[in-house]
From Swiss-Prot:
It comes from Xenopus laevis. SUPFAM superfamilies: beta-beta-alpha zinc fingers (SSF57667). Probable transcriptional regulator involved in developmental processes. May act as a transcriptional repressor (Potential). Involved in two major neuronal regionalization processes: primary anteroposterior (AP) axis patterning of the CNS and segmentation of the cranial neuronal crest (CNS) development. Residues 26-36 have a biased composition (Acidic residues). InterPro entries: HD, Teashirt_fam, Znf_C2H2_sf, Znf_C2H2_type. Gene3D superfamilies: Classic Zinc Finger. This is Teashirt homolog 1-B. GO terms for cellular component: nucleus. The gene is tshz1-b. The lineage of its organism: Eukaryota, Metazoa, Chordata, Craniata, Vertebrata.
Length: 1077
């Protein structure tokens, strides 16, 4: 219906002269037909709008929600009038009650009275625009109906008001009663206007509370104002409305108006009355208006406020706490907070006028709507308000779905709501979903699984039906999603943690049978399907598991699972290896090789990237469906779990890459390999156990360990040794070259070792260096057949020095020359086995030749090894502990550091109390240093600032300790001498430098170099006391890079390696031999 132009409202009868009243009566007679013709349409729009109000206004306890019937057909105009009376009849005003009584008696005594009398009564009673349709309805029925029906109608309409909701205290006075619908019904002297359902009048609502406190007679224009919601309007916006405000401003466009009427007309014409909370985020930023209370967005910033003032259920953000509270009360979302998602998102974005139809579509199967026909009669709807409004549920009379319907809705959608977003498993309760997330670590993987891995986790329909969550009771066995094979229905039965809790005594296995099964599977991977008929664990599965090792897993199952998930997902919160996750973020490459030693029962969806490999190779790696996965997984996963906890997977990666490379290089027939391996396994296990006992004995001899330490070593050592064997033999058995090799194992291993082996933080206790022990064991296991005749003496020397001060990663090359004692009694069983192991050992040698970490095995000069040019590394440990350079390798020229340290020491000022005060170096000294050393002034300033910061923060730095205590100790970086006073320290540094600091600005570089060659002899004599002078004692050696001189070739090589990072092959280039004088 087209919107009519709004005109000034009519005033109440108290202010209308008699002649105007008569003129209005005649005009209304002329417009009577128009008013009646609009009744049906008016009622339609009113009902639509009343439904919207029920959605947006729950703070008002209005009876409208239980008395109206928007769905039961529109019936007669009289039902509308009855509803209006029920909604807006006032019971709080004594004056209004008196008038109601008067009206009832008048209607009874003058049923056939003239229109003027009825008009006067209604004008005096209501004086509100919204009653005009009612008056016209009654007048029409008055003309056409009998006196009895008229009396019935009027009395019924009057009676419906006071009795509609006696228990609801209405806060509306008769003077301020108006239509609760969002349409504005303003009756003027010549028209009856009903706006279309475009929204309620904000500005009439703006004065509701003020009107409730104002007497009827004082209101100049009572018909302007609605009692509908002004919960969001601010009095500051308009000034104080009734204290002389001269302008009324539109909150959207800031247009100013002299009267509220004009502003109301403007608002209705332009549509500037819409609800802020339904605006889009982009539009909300254009708002200039402030909420009634002080805005949190002004105080905290918009982002912080939106994070705080946000509905946890639907995600709406609000400008003030009051807005959020109103929203919560209206929508009852505070009852639904624990679970997100159920509300259809479409209802948040559509206009309010269309929302009702969309809600009809959104929940067509709602139990509340069952059996309700649109054509229900008025009496039925009045008797059953719940049936009349399908959105009014027992717990909520204002329109949103909750209570019983919410319970039904949640039950219907529980499979989608309580669903793991990573693996797709559904759960019955939130607690089960939480337990599943914690056990599997999927809460970490959800955000970065698909995007970071570059692979989408494809879930087959059959697989989704088979997925079952990990239940809360720890004794039950659950299936895990077999996402790592190409044939989901043939997924193996993954064992959970509860399997690992079984008594290890039950898990005895015949190794020959195991290897036979692996061999059969290797030859014909397609024979595995019948074995998948059992979806749960059986006693046979437990019996087939290998013996030993699971008692350790009992204590580690929780920490290991979290460590694995964090290492795979790049979120390491555990200490020691802060950057370990970077190695596993190489895009989709390194992970492709992991499943050969993968722990399936802990990370079910971990192998989603295995899709890159061929199905044959996949089947071989995982052995799907046969009875051999339990032994394979128990052996290898036990190894992986411990290694991941201790070393962050560095070693497992190394061994995997070695095995994969060996497969690619030498693709030998699988059957003979498997047969030979049967002979290999038992001796190797015996050797590993012997090694374990031997190592533990050696640990306890030189070191006094606490029981906890020895327990840790006793626990982890045998498992590592044993399963390292399993890993090696597995690689030989499944000697099957993959069809597709997407990554060069050599480059992958190099990148990992380059990134991490140099960065692994040093162990706190040298006797508890699991990384070094694992390297030792794995390498000796690989190489033991190659050196079968090594004498016993070398093994003793290994064990004697192995657990001494090992503060750096072990030198992999050294262990190859010193095999185990038991290798003497274990001759090479066949050329095939020897060649396979030699391939592996050569691979390891090639990989570790350039990436050798620094040795942690001190030895004497007579015993040092020359393998792979590692002599310069060993000599570092031959020095006394004070000669070792700790911390990061410095790129500073040592001479420059000596100059800077000497200058800084000279700048210290001693106070009367004996303490030292730091004073800045003057610009002159900085210029001298800069000219001599070539360092920039900025670099010098940064070095000085860093030293001062360290001294202020900790009281010491590398060359100066205890400055804050008044008893400083100065350290010489060259010879580790200690000095108590700054002056002696400076004099000592000047002997190293070969010149005095005072002469720094006068000397040229050539003079200094010549003087250095002479004065460095004094320093070399100090070094000779350590016993490092080689046989060519008649000469000194000078470093060409920094012109420092050394007493021996070994010392200058050590200097080049430590200070300049030069390799031993390049030492000849940078060393100049000088004759001693």
């Amino acid at each position: 219906m087209p919107r009519r132009k709004q005109q000034a409202p009519r005033r109440s009868a108290a202010y209308v002269p008699a002649e105007e009243l008569k003129a209005a009566e005649t005009e209304e007679d002329n417009l009577e037909d128009d008013g009646l013709s609009l009744d049906v349409q008016d009622s339609e729009y009113l009902y639509n709008d009343e439904h919207e109000i029920k959605e947006t206004q729950s703070y008002q306890n209005s009876p409208i929600s239980s008395a109206t019937n928007p769905d039961a057909g529109y019936g007669s105009p009289f039902s509308e009038a009855s509803d209006h009376l029920a909604d807006f009849k006032s019971t709080s005003s004594k004056e209004g009650q008196d008038k109601e009584d008067g009206q009832s008696t008048e209607n009874a005594s003058y049923p056939t009275d003239s229109l003027a009398q009825i008009k006067a009564v209604y004008t005096n009673l209501l004086s509100e625009c919204c009653w005009s349709n009612l008056a016209l309805d009654l007048k029409k029925s008055n003309e056409k109906a009998s006196p009895t029906t008229n009396t019935d109608k009027s009395s019924k309409s009057e009676a419906s008001g006071p009795t509609s909701d006696p228990g609801t205290p209405t806060t509306i006075t008769s003077s301020s009663c108006t239509n609760t619908s969002t349409s504005i019904c303003v009756t003027t002297s010549n028209s009856a206007i009903s706006n279309t359902a475009s929204g309620y009048d904000w500005h009439q609502a703006a004065l509701a509370k003020t009107l409730q406190q104002t007497s009827y007679g004082l209101l100049p224009e009572p018909s302007l104002f609605s009692t509908v919601q002004l919960y969001r309007q601010s009095n500051k916006l308009y000034g104080s409305v009734f204290t002389g405000a001269s302008k009324f401003r539109c909150k959207d466009c800031s247009a100013a108006y002299d009267t509220l009427v004009e502003l109301t007309v403007h608002m209705n014409e332009t549509g500037h009355y819409r609800d802020d909370n339904r605006d889009r985020e982009a539009e909300r930023t254009k708002r200039w208006s402030k909420p009634r209370k002080r805005s949190l967005m002004e105080m905290e910033g918009k982002e912080d406020a939106q994070k705080v003032l946000k509905c946890m259920y639907c995600g709406h953000s609000f400008e003030s706490l009051q807005d959020l509270s109103v929203h919560m009360i209206k929508t009852k979302h505070y009852q639904k907070v624990p679970l997100k998602e159920p509300v259809p998102a479409i209802t948040k974005l559509v206009p309010s006028t269309k929302k009702r139809a969309l809600q009809d579509i959104a929940l067509p199967d709602s139990p509340e709507q069952a059996g309700i026909s649109p054509g229900a009669s008025v009496s039925e709807s009045a008797k059953d308000p719940k049936a009349a409004n399908p959105y009014v549920t027992p717990n909520n009379r204002y329109g949103y779905q909750n209570g019983a319907s919410y319970t039904w809705q949640f039950e219907a959608r529980k499979a989608q709501i309580l669903k793991c977003m990573e693996c797709g498993s559904s759960h019955d309760t939130l607690q089960q979903l939480t337990a599943h997330m914690m056990v599997t670590g999927h809460f970490l993987k959800v955000t970065n699984s698909a995007s970071k891995k570059g692979k989408q986790l494809v879930m087959d329909a059959v697989l989704e039906e088979k997925i079952q969550s990990i239940p809360l009771p720890p004794t039950t066995h659950a299936r895990l999603p077999a996402t790592y094979i190409k044939k989901p229905p043939d997924s193996p039965t993954g064992s959970t943690h509860s399997e690992e809790k079984k008594d290890p005594e039950k898990e005895k296995v015949n190794i020959g049978e195991v290897e036979k099964k692996i061999k059969e599977e290797n030859e014909d991977p397609e024979k595995i399907e019948p074995a998948t008929l059992y979806q749960y664990l059986r006693e046979e599965d437990l019996d087939d598991s290998p013996k030993g090792g699971l008692d350790i897993l009992k204590s580690l199952e929780n920490t290991v699972s979290s460590a694995i998930s964090k290492a795979q997902n790049g979120a390491p919160s555990w200490g020691g290896y802060p950057s370990i996750h970077a190695a596993y973020q190489l895009p989709g490459t390194i992970k492709a090789l992991q499943p050969s030693v993968q722990s399936v029962q802990i990370q079910p969806s971990y192998a989603s990237s295995v899709k890159t490999m061929s199905s044959d190779h996949n089947a071989l790696i995982h052995s799907p469906g046969s009875l051999t996965p339990p032994p394979h997984k128990s052996n290898v996963s036990a190894m992986e779990e411990l290694v991941e906890k201790v070393t962050g997977k560095i070693n497992v990666k190394k061994e995997e890459k070695v095995l994969e490379k060996e497969k690619v290089i030498s693709a030998k027939p699988p059957s003979p390999m498997a047969k030979e391996n049967k002979e290999i396994l038992k001796p190797e296990e015996a050797n590993s156990k012997t090694l374990k006992k031997h190592n533990e004995a050696e640990i306890q001899k030189p070191k006094k360990e606490t029981p906890i330490e020895s327990h840790a070593l006793n626990g982890t050592e045998p498992l590592k040794a044993k399963v390292t064997n399993g890993c090696t033999s597995l690689g030989i058995i499944t000697d099957h070259s993959p069809e597709q090799s997407f990554i060069n194992p050599l480059s992958a291993l190099q990148s990992i070792m380059n990134t991490h082996l140099g960065k692994v933080s040093k162990p706190v206790s040298p006797s508890l260096d699991p990384l070094a022990m694992l390297y030792k064991i794995s390498n000796s296991m690989l190489d033991k057949p190659i050196y079968p005749t090594t004498p016993m003496k070398q093994v003793e020397s290994i064990d004697r020095y192995y657990y001494e001060d090992s503060d750096q990663p072990i030198d992999l090359t050294k262990s190859k020359n010193k095999p185990l004692v038991t290798s003497i009694t274990d001759p090479v069983s066949s050329p095939l086995r020897e060649s396979a192991l030699m391939d592996i050992s050569d691979m390891v040698k090639n990989l570790t030749g350039r990436l050798t970490p620094k040795s942690s095995t001190p030895s004497t000069v007579s015993e040092k090894s020359d393998a792979d040019g590692s002599s310069f590394e060993e000599a570092l440990d031959e020095l006394s502990p004070v000669h070792k350079r700790k911390g990061r390798q410095s790129n500073w020229n040592p001479q420059h550091l000596l100059i800077l340290q000497a200058q800084f020491a000279s700048s210290l000022r001693e106070t009367a109390e004996g303490k030292y005060i730091m004073s800045d170096l003057g610009p002159q000294e900085r210029v001298h240093i800069s000219k001599f050393t070539g360092l920039s002034m900025t670099t010098i300033s940064h070095w000085l600032a860093n030293v001062k910061y360290q001294l202020r923060r900790t009281g010491g730095t590398k060359f100066l300790k205890n400055l804050d205590t008044g008893h400083p100790v100065f350290f010489c970086n060259d010879c580790a001498s200690q000095f108590r006073t700054a002056s002696t320290y400076i004099g000592h540094l000047e002997t190293h430098l070969g010149f005095s600091l005072k002469d720094l600005s006068k000397l040229s570089l050539n003079q200094i170099q010549e003087q250095q060659n002479v004065t460095k002899v004094i320093t070399n004599k100090a070094l000779s006391s350590v016993g490092l002078i080689e046989e060519d004692s008649g000469s000194t050696f000078q470093c060409k890079l920094c012109n420092r001189t050394f007493a021996s070739k070994h010392a200058v090589k050590l200097h080049l390696s430590k200070t300049h990072g030069k390799s031993p092959e390049d030492h000849v280039i940078y060393v100049t031999e000088l004759e001693k004088q």
